[in-house]
């Protein structure tokens, strides 16, 4: 799995060409990872903390395959599948680059060949033409298993010129690359295509396969840390008093509740509480200008 972002397209194509003659594959670039429950976990897919791994039921193999270009949405859909009483057969994120080395077509064919997989859950977005290849596979019965899809980016049709979403590929330069066109071609091919994210969740809940009762509990083994030495770093910004986290001499929760985000950001940056309201307003103005107000994010569901 290649986790790195901004890998030159030339390098990706070279890797793709080199792998053609070998019985191996690479997921990425810009991928969050590859996951096969109870067998393999590469990357942050499914979570990084013990609590997240337990909640994602990674020790319980199932029959639902999850695919998406978006790393964040891959994890979100994994949790959605689990929340609907289903379990994963495997999951992966292609990465948001224009030329992922392991394509959605290859992933769908792998799921079709996997005897454990009964349902394929796919989160796509505007840009590119991968969905047309997927629709062709479905219509030609090369993919016979249940396919549930959501295609993000319909909001792009509201703009006079096509907006660039967060991923390099997420730009509909032509009509065939729009989310509306992709939804239609997949639906016409026989896939189940949701018109809203809530409908997408409902489709997953009603999908084929086994529903698992959430009864089994797993204990997370905590490593014995009694041999750890105290840190030799003294901080005047953060600390704790009787187990309560402190920021600049004030309780963390109270500090976050009583002050604006601009005040907190400026104070932490300077290492002391700011006194100037003009500075606070200036920082607030800068943050408002920099924040992403529009739909230009990967996997936008609005």
Task: Mark where each language-model region is.
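Catalytic-core regions of core metabolic enzymes
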Residues: 1-254, 260, 268, 272-302
């Amino acid at each position: 799995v290649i986790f790195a972002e901004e890998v030159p397209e030339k390098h990706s194509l070279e890797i793709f060409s080199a792998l053609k003659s070998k019985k191996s594959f690479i997921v990425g670039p810009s991928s969050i990872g590859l996951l096969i429950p109870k067998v393999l976990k590469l990357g942050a897919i499914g979570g990084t903390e013990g609590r997240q791994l337990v909640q994602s039921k990674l020790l319980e193999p199932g029959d639902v395959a999850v695919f998406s270009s978006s790393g964040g949405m891959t994890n979100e859909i994994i949790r959605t599948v689990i929340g609907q009483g289903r379990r994963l057969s495997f999951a992966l994120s292609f990465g948001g680059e224009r030329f992922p080395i392991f394509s959605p077509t290859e992933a769908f064919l792998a799921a079709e060949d996997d005897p454990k997989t009964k349902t394929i859950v796919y989160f796509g977005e505007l840009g590119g033409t991968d969905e047309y290849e997927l629709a062709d596979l479905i219509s030609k019965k090369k993919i016979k298993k249940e396919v549930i899809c959501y295609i993000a980016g319909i909001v792009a049709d509201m703009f006079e010129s096509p907006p660039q979403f967060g991923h390099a590929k997420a730009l509909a330069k032509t009509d065939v690359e729009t989310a509306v066109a992709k939804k239609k071609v997949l639906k016409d091919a026989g896939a189940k295509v949701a018109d809203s994210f809530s409908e997408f969740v409902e489709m997953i809940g009603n999908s084929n396969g086994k529903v698992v009762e959430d009864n089994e509990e797993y204990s997370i083994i905590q490593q014995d840390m009694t041999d750890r030495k105290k840190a030799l770093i003294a901080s005047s910004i953060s600390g704790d008093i009787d187990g309560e986290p402190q920021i600049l001499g004030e309780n963390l929760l109270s500090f976050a509740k009583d002050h604006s985000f601009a005040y907190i950001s400026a104070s932490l940056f300077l290492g002391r509480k700011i006194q100037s309201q003009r500075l606070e307003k200036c920082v607030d103005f800068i943050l408002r200008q920099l924040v992403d107000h529009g739909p230009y994010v990967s996997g936008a569901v609005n």
